[in-house]
Amino acid sequence: MIRSCRIQGPNNTAISFADHLLNRSFFTTSIVNLDAQFNLQASTTSHDDPAKIIATQLSNCTTLQELNQIYAHVIRTHLLQLYPAPFHWNNIIRSYTRRDAPTKALFVYLAMSRSGVLPDCYTLPIILKALCQLFAVEVGRQLHSVALRLGLDSNEYCESGFINLYSKAGEFENARNMFEQNPERKLGSWNAIIGGLSQGGRAKEAIDTFMELRKCGFLPDDVTMVSITSACGSLSDLGLALQLHKCVYQAKNVDKSDALMLNSLIDMYGKCGRMDLAYRVFSRMEQQNVSSWTSMIVGYAMHGHVNEALECFRCMREAGVRPNHVTFVGVLSACVHGGTVQEGEFYFDMMKSTYGIKPHLQHYGCLVDLLGRAGLLKEARKMVEEMPMKANSVVWGCLMGACEKHGNVKMGEWVAKHLQELEPWNDGAYVVLSNIYASRGLWKEVERVRLIMYQRKLAKAPGYSLSTSGD
C-alpha cells in the first residue's frame, strides 16, 4: 500500500500520500512501516500539506494510544523541524490535554521549548490547563516569567489560566494579584477568580467578587453562574439562592435547558435545605442526567430524608441512568442517617458487583460510620484494617465517635493512638478519649489525658472567673 503512493497518476503527478494517510485504520496499524517508507519529497511537493494531514489525524484520533502513535511519527519524521510554527505544537499539546494526559502534554511543551520554538497566546492557556490538572504551580511560575518576557501576561486567556492555576494551588493572594494587575480585565478573568475562590472554599469572597463584577457593569455568563451558585450552596444562604436563580436567566449564553446550569441550581437548593425547590428544578428538566439524580440523592441524604433518597435512587435505576461513585456516596450516606446496616451493605456490594465501581475512601468511610453507629465496632474495625487504602482522619474520627457513643474504652484507646499518629497537633482524639474514660468513671485516666494535653500544649488552660463573692 505504501508503494502505491509512489506510482504516477493520470497527469504524471505523484498520487497524494494524504489519500492513504487520512485513512485512520491504515495510519494506526501501519505506523512502523509508514515511518520506514515515508517519502518526504513526494509528500511535500504534492498539493497536500503534511502538517495539515497530521492536524487532521490529531482531530480524528479517538484514543491515547493513537495519539501516542501520531506524535511518535511526527518526531521520527522531523515534521516539527520542517514546520516549526507553534500552531503544530499547540495541536499536539491540546490533544493530550483533552485526553486527560497532562504529563505528556507538559513533555511536549518542554520538547517545544528545547527546539527553540516560542509559545504564543494559544500555547500558554493550553499548557496551563495541563498544569492545573497536575497542580504543578512551580512550573506555572516559570511559565509566568515566560509570559511576562513575551508580553502575554495580560492576554485574557493567559491571565485566566494563571488565576486558575494559582487558585487550585491555594495561592489565592497570587491569584488575586494576577487579577488586580489588569485594569481592563475581561469576563474570563472574572470567571477564573470567582471559580477559584468558590472551589477553594472561599465562598464569601466569591460572592463579594461577583457583586463587584455586577457593579462594574459586566453581565455574567453560564460559567459565572455555575461557580456562584456553588458558592451560595456552600453558604446555605437561601435568600441569596433565590436571587441568583432569577439572575440565571438574565445571564449571557444561558440555555434554559442547560443541564450543567440546572444541576448547579439543584445542588444549591439542596445545600440550602430546600429539597422542594430542588425537586421543582429537577422535575422541569427535559432530561435528567447522572449528575441531576445524584444531586437529588445527595441533597435528600444530607438532610436525613432517607426514604426519599433511596426512592430517588430506585427511580434513577428504573430510568436507565447508570449511577457513578458519587451517587453511591449519597446512597450510603442515607443509610448512615437511617441506621440501616443491611441496606448499606447491600448497596455497597451492588456498587462493586453490579456496576463495577471500585470503592473509594468515602465509601469505606460511610460503611465504617454505619457499622460504628450501630454498635458493630468489631466489624467496623475489621473494615478499617482490611481497606485497600489507609484510613484518613475522617474515617478514624467516625470510629472514635462510635467508641464514645458506646463507651468502648479498649477500642477507643486503639483508635486514639492512630489519630494521634496521623494528626499529633489535633486535640480532638484526646478530648474524646477523656470523655470515654469519664463515662466509665476512670478519673485517673481522665487526669492523665489532661496532663498529656497540657504538656503538649494541645488545650487551653482552664478559665478563671474574675468576680468575687463580695461583688
Q: Language-model features: where?
A:
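Terminal (and in a subset, N-terminal) low-complexity or junction segments at the ends
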Residues: M1-K186, G195-D471
